[in-house]
C-alpha cells in the first residue's frame, strides 16, 4: 500500500508500550489495540546480564526443568493418618514452634502470628496466663522455625507445636511425607491469632477426640487419594485454596465409611462427621500438604529454575527454587487487594500471610480460578478476570497439570511450574487468592482478595542462580 493511500483509509492503530497515547486515540475515536509491552527484566542491566549468562546453560536448564515437572506431576500422594506432630514431624523438638513463611524472629512477627504463638504456648501448658506466655515467647527459650523447614505447611499464621495433631500425607511415588494441622473452621481460630479459652478447648478436642477416631478411620479405608479429590473438585467449582466446598464434601464421602466402622462411641463419630460437615475449609489443610509433598519431590534438581515454595509470614514473602540449594529469597510482603467484611477496611489488614500459596505453586488455587467462578464473590473482580488469570499463568510456567482441568476453558489444564526466568523476563507475577487477617491478634479474618509476590523475590533468586552456575 502506498503511503498516500493511508489518508483515505480508516486508521487502525497498534500502540506499543506507553498507555498515555491510548487516551488520545480514545478521544479521537480511532480503532486501536494496546500492547502492554515492557523491556525484558524491566530493562535492568544487571538482570539482563544474569539472563544472558543463564542462556548459556539453556539445554541443561531445560532438561532439569523437565525432570522437575516429571517428578512433581507423577507424585501420587495419600492421606494415611493423623498423628501428634512431635511423633512424626522431622526435627520438631520440645519447646519449638513452627510458623508460616520464611525465617523470622519473634520480635519482628506480625500481630496474628504472635497471638497464635501465645495460644500455642498455653495449649502446650508451657505457661498458665497470656502474660506468662508472651514473656516466654520473648525470652528466647522457645525456638521458632518455618514449617517448610520441617516438611510441613500451615495456613495463615501456620502455627504448629509438638502436641498438635497433624494430617500425615505420604508420597507413594518418591517416599517423602508432608504434614499439616487440622483446619479449625472460620471465625475466632488460632491461625488468625485468636487464643481464648474456647479456641484452646477446640484444639484440645481435636487432639483427644477427633485425631484418634480419624486416624483409625483413615487406616480402615486404606488411606485417601487426595490428588483424585482435587481433580474432581476443580471440575465441580473449587480451586482448592479459598473454595473447598466440593473437595470437603468429597473427602467426607470418602471417610464416612471408615468413621462408621471405627471402634468409637456413636456420639464421638457424629461429632467428627459434623465437624467436617460444618467446615467447608476443612480440605484446605489437605490440599496444602498434598502440594507440599509433591513439590518436595522436585527439590534440589541442579539447574532447575522452577519454584518449589511461595510462603508468607505477615512481614516477608519468601520463595524457594529447585536448583538454588534450599535458599530463601525474601522481600517485604504486599497487602492483599480485595473485599472486606462489613466493618473492616484496608487499614485493619495485616500483610500477606500463610503457607497456603503452596497451592498456587503447584498450579491450583489462583491458577485454577477459572474453574471456580463463584470465588469472585469472595475475593473480588469479575468471572472474566478469573478465567484470564488461569490463562495468563501459562506465560510464566514450564508445563501444565493434565490431572487438573478447567471446564469453562474447554477443560484446559491448569498452568504449573513457575519458571523463575519467565517471571523475570516477562514481568508477569504469579496470582494468589487468599484470606486477609486482621493486623491485631485474635480478631480473625477481615476479608479476602488477590495478591502477587514481590518481583524482588524473583530478581534476587535469578541473580543467585546465575552466580552459582557451574558445569
Model-predicted segments: where are they?
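Anaerobic metallocofactor- and corrinoid-dependent redox/one-carbon enzyme cores
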Residues: 2-471
Amino acid at each position: 500500500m502506498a503511503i498516500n493511500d493511508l489518508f483515505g483509509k480508516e486508521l487502525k492503530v497498534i500502540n506499543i508500550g506507553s498507555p498515555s497515547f491510548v487516551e488520545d486515540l480514545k478521544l479521537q475515536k480511532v480503532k486501536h489495540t494496546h500492547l502492554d509491552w515492557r523491556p525484558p527484566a524491566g530493562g535492568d542491566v544487571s538482570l539482563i546480564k544474569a539472563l544472558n549468562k543463564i542462556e548459556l546453560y539453556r539445554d541443561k536448564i531445560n532438561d532439569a526443568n523437565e525432570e522437575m515437572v516429571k517428578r512433581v506431576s507423577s507424585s501420587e500422594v495419600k492421606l494415611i493418618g493423623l498423628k501428634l506432630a512431635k511423633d512424626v514431624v522431622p526435627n520438631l523438638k520440645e519447646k519449638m514452634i513452627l510458623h508460616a513463611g520464611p525465617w523470622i524472629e519473634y520480635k519482628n512477627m506480625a500481630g496474628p502470628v504472635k497471638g497464635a504463638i501465645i495460644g500455642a504456648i498455653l495449649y502446650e501448658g508451657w505457661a498458665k496466663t497470656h502474660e506468662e506466655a508472651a514473656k516466654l515467647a520473648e525470652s528466647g527459650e522457645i525456638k521458632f522455625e518455618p514449617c517448610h523447614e520441617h516438611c510441613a505447611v500451615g495456613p495463615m499464621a501456620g502455627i504448629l507445636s509438638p502436641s498438635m495433631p497433624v494430617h500425615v500425607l505420604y508420597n507413594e511415588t518418591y517416599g517423602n511425607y508432608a504434614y499439616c494441622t487440622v483446619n479449625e473452621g472460620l471465625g475466632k481460630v488460632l491461625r488468625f491469632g485468636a487464643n481464648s479459652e474456647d479456641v484452646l478447648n477446640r484444639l484440645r478436642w481435636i487432639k483427644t477426640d477427633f485425631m484418634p477416631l480419624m486416624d483409625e478411620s483413615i487406616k480402615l479405608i486404606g488411606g485417601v487419594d487426595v490428588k483424585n479429590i482435587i481433580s474432581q473438585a476443580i471440575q465441580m467449582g473449587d480451586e482448592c485454596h479459598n473454595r473447598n466446598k466440593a473437595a470437603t464434601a468429597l473427602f467426607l464421602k470418602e471417610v464416612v465409611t471408615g468413621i462408621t466402622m471405627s471402634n468409637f462411641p456413636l456420639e464421638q463419630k457424629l461429632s467428627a462427621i459434623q465437624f467436617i460437615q460444618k467446615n467447608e475449609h476443612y480440605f484446605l489443610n489437605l490440599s496444602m500438604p498434598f502440594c507440599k509433598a509433591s513439590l518436595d519431590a522436585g527439590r534440589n534438581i541442579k539447574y532447575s529454575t522452577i519454584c518449589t515454595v511461595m510462603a508468607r509470614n505477615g512481614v516477608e514473602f519468601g520463595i524457594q527454587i529447585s536448583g538454588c540449594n534450599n535458599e530463601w529469597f525474601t522481600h517485604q510482603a504486599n497487602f492483599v487487594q480485595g473485599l472486606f467484611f462489613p466493618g473492616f477496611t484496608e487499614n485493619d489488614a495485616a500483610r500477606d500471610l500463610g503457607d497456603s500459596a503452596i497451592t498456587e505453586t503447584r498450579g491450583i488455587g489462583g491458577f485454577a480460578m477459572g474453574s471456580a467462578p463463584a470465588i469472585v464473590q469472595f475475593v473480588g473482580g469479575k468471572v472474566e478476570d478469573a478465567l484470564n488469570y488461569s490463562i495468563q499463568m501459562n506465560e510464566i510456567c514450564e508445563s501444565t497439570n493434565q490431572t487438573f482441568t478447567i471446564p469453562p476453558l474447554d477443560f484446559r489444564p491448569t498452568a504449573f511450574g513457575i519458571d523463575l526466568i519467565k517471571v523475570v523476563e516477562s514481568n508477569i507475577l504469579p496470582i494468589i487468592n487468599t484470606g486477609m487477617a486482621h493486623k491485631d491478634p485474635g480478631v480473625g479474618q477481615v476479608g479476602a482478595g488477590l495478591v502477587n509476590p514481590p518481583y524482588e523475590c524473583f530478581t534476587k533468586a535469578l541473580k543467585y542462580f546465575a552466580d552459582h552456575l557451574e558445569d
